[in-house]
């Protein structure tokens, strides 16, 4: 590339390959979601079994940005609340805060996260050992908060923190046997020095430069306080057509927030394509970036299935458990279900199975027989998991174009 030449806009496939060069096995949807969501800002919950690579995936996604070593502040799981305020300078310099396993932090995280969740700085008086006096320390809210939760830890349950859960994009790490085999094979390749990156050094530098530009562009859409107004917003003229297609199933109230999450991720994809997207002014003077049907399509491919399952109140191991019960129309104990899942290649504990069944029982997906021992089977409502949206992308494009023509001057 000659001096002054603008680097080619990388495809999302290239971004994914660069993230996997960290190196990382599998986790394609999570890596792309993290890389696209980090510049957009907000709250991300990343749950999954212990030792399933959540921190590694965060580091892998952040490696797609320039100077990524200084992008993410990983909160030590052993840090006390007071100790974090002594780190305020370092925390305030890094736009992404990655909170490790919350269950191991006792209540360290609650005061800070409650402040940051409301868009407020978190303040505390601490003793400055160099001055020998009490001073105020402030941790500013970061652009993006990532909260990790180990689903096999009995000390924490995401459902107990509804306010945090309702504001977040929620990802789940892959704890399957197949993923473990892929990770071990990659580890062996690295140890044997046979692993080779997919992206060359020059192209990797170009991709990181572009991705860092996404972060910089995001500043005009971001606010640090609830009282602030951003310099620009997004306009998604395809939103109504997508809503009409019932991409998000409306069976449960959760669909309301999942619909908003999906639209936010569509904005994140548009932000990624900022170099190719129109920034314009509406009649009321508002500056907007237009979210295109292409952005919506990418968002559906990367994130749509997660939103569909979330709207159906199916998360974690629910799909595996419910699919098994539908295939075997009888009733089974927790231990029997666990053994069948393990034989099918899923790494699950009896606690995973029990929590999944209890969650689905409250939503009507399974029937509990109070025998001795208790047994479970799929209910007629389990057929909801076959839900398919009625989206017609040609119709989405046509309606989006009509909306744009009706709201923008002809010269634009």
Report each predicted region and the residues it spans.
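Long, charge-rich low-complexity segments
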Residues: 61-85, 89, 308-337
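Conserved ASCE/P-loop NTPase catalytic core
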Residues: 22-205
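Short, hydrophobic-biased segments on the C-terminal half of alpha helices
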Residues: 62, 263, 354-358
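Charged, amphipathic alpha-helical linker segments immediately N-terminal to NTP-binding catalytic cores
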Residues: 1-28
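Structural motif
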Residues: 21-31, 251-260
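Terminal-proximal interaction/regulatory segments of ATP-powered molecular machines
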Residues: 312-412
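Phosphate-sensing "switch" segment of ASCE/P-loop ATPases
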Residues: 139-144, 152, 158-320, 324, ...
